[in-house]
Amino acid sequence: MKKGGGRNKGFPQDDESSISLRQLMVNEGLIPSLEDEVKRRGVINQLRKIVVRWVKNVAWQHRLPQNQIDATNATILPYGSYGLGVYGSESDIDALCIGPFFASIAEDFFISLRDMLKSRREVSELHCVKDAKVPLIRFKFDGILVDLPYAQLRVLSIPNNVDVLNPFFLRDIDETSWKILSGVRANKCILQLVPSLELFQSLLRCVKLWAKRRGVYGNLNGFLGGVHMAILAAFVCGYQPNATLSSLLANFFYTFAHWQWPTPVVLLEDTYPSTGAPPGLMPIQLPCGSHQYCNSTITRSTFYKIVAEFLLGHNLTKDYLKLNFSWKDLFELYPYANTYTWFTKIHLSAANQEDLSDWVGWVKSRFRCLLIKIEEVYGICDPNPTEYVETYTKQPNIVFYWGLQLRTINVSDIESVKIDFLKNVNSGSFRGTVGRIQLTLVKASQLPKNGECGSNNRSKKVTKTCWRIREDKQCNNVPVYSKHLPGYVVGYQKMVNREADGMEVKC
């Protein structure tokens, strides 16, 4: 990362503009309270105690010598928005459980640790996601949502603050653990590289709010995710180590409005020389590994939308030193209803709210395929990430409205899009109760009055791509016995009845 730039010391307006921007952050609720921080820190500390007890119990089950049982250890490392210090009051916690070589993910993590967590009074809504790219346990601890993946290192004991950048701990680990560790390693690299942690955190809070308001935030919809935004913010901070917050935010939009994509954004230049063309339309290199890039779902449509918003952001912030400048325009909600004539309406429903959460999470994990198909049929599509609820419908539902750029549309073409998408949804291994999908085309004039961005009808909590292991009549509790202590039950696993399989979604 090159260092350069400087603070505009000759302009008192710069300080005034930064004060105004910080006040906006407070007004928007971007700064969590001290109580929020204490509560989250308490959750992490409790989880660390739990996994230490868990791993010692696992060591005993594996019949390790007493001295090794006493010495072994596991730990919890927070990452994501909480690890970077940019979480909000509604944010969840991404926390990685790191265990030693003998603690397996299949038996010890997903069964033994899951049952230990489930027995805790602070834990509720515990789900397991085994088939995802990042297998994890998801639950609420004292009301705070926690995503807990697992990585296994080839050592007996994990230091409490293990250095995940140290090659000693990374030797001979499996591919799943390597992928999971990449997020934690990226966090640590970013925090080491930025010249001012406080300014980086403030800048990242601002650009994430901007991305959400302008509809360009969310990996599942083909936009920028949290790690993308963090690297872009760190990149700008590295070029202006002495800048004010307002100068950094204006320079953020100047930099990426003029960026020559697909030139990759690289924090550590020349550290890992590239041997081939970087992947994707907007390649952003992870700062912690050779030739590793952020996972990207950006398509032709979303690329154009992101670039357009960078340009608009630059036009809105280039005069930030002028008298009476206001930051509010930068964070205006995107005017979907005034921009597009036609919309693809995606209506998802289920029998109850819990089933709906699982169903929406599964369907959203297939959204990129739907977006590409719509692009083939209709051209440019703007997949608004906002989740709406049709309050006049009794059945629990979530609705999406994706803008289409064409002025005239062949309505019958939606049938081919629908058939193709249903095949994709049915081709996976969804473990929950199958819901319902309806794909239709509607005009902007047909949008519900409260269906526009910024309405009170917006769902506050975005549904995650997670589906639970069902705990209903379609499942049986099957005891799982230790491989090392015959007759010793380590926990119970949910097994889906065969007759419940083979269900397909229909419109």
UniProtKB/Swiss-Prot annotation:
- Annotated site residue numbers, Interaction with RNA: 368, 373
Annotated Pfam families: PAP_central, PAP_NTPase
By its UniProt entry, which SUPFAM superfamilies does this protein fall under?
Nucleotidyltransferase (SSF81301), PAP/Archaeal CCA-adding enzyme, C-terminal domain (SSF55003), PAP/OAS1 substrate-binding domain (SSF81631)
EC class (word): transferase
On tissue specificity, the annotation reads: Expressed in leaves (mostly in petioles and tips), cotyledon, roots (tips, vascular tissue of the radicle, and throughout the root tissue excluding the elongation zone), stems, and flowers (restricted to the stigma and the pollen in mature anthers). Active in the primary and secondary root systems.
Q: Which cofactor does it need?
A: Mg(2+); Mn(2+)
Keyword terms, alphabetized: ATP-binding, Magnesium, Metal-binding, mRNA processing, Nucleotide-binding, Nucleotidyltransferase, Nucleus, Transferase
Ligand binding (Mg(2+) 2): 92, 94, 147
Cellular component terms, GO, for this chain's entry?
A: cytoplasm; nucleus
The record's EC number reads: 2.7.7.19
As to how many cofactors bind and how, the note says: Binds 2 magnesium ions. Also active with manganese.
InterPro entries, alphabetized: NT_sf, NuclTrfase_I-like_C, PolA_pol_cen_dom, PolA_pol_NTPase, PolyA_polymerase
Top-rank taxon: Eukaryota
Knockout-associated phenotype: Lethal.
Extract the coiled-coil ranges from the record.
none
Residues that coordinate or bind ATP: 79-81, 91-94, 147, 208, 217, 226-227
Binding locations of Mg(2+) 1: 92, 94
> Which family does the UniProt entry place this protein in?
Belongs to the poly(A) polymerase family.
Sorted alphabetically, which PANTHER family does this protein's record hold?
NUCLEAR POLY(A) POLYMERASE 3 (PTHR10682:SF33), POLY A POLYMERASE (PTHR10682)
Assembly, in brief, is:
Monomer. Forms a complex with cleavage and polyadenylation specificity factor (CPSF) subunits FIPS5 and CPSF30.
Entry protein name: Nuclear poly(A) polymerase 3
Organism whose genome encodes this protein: Arabidopsis thaliana (Mouse-ear cress)
Name of the coding gene: PAPS3
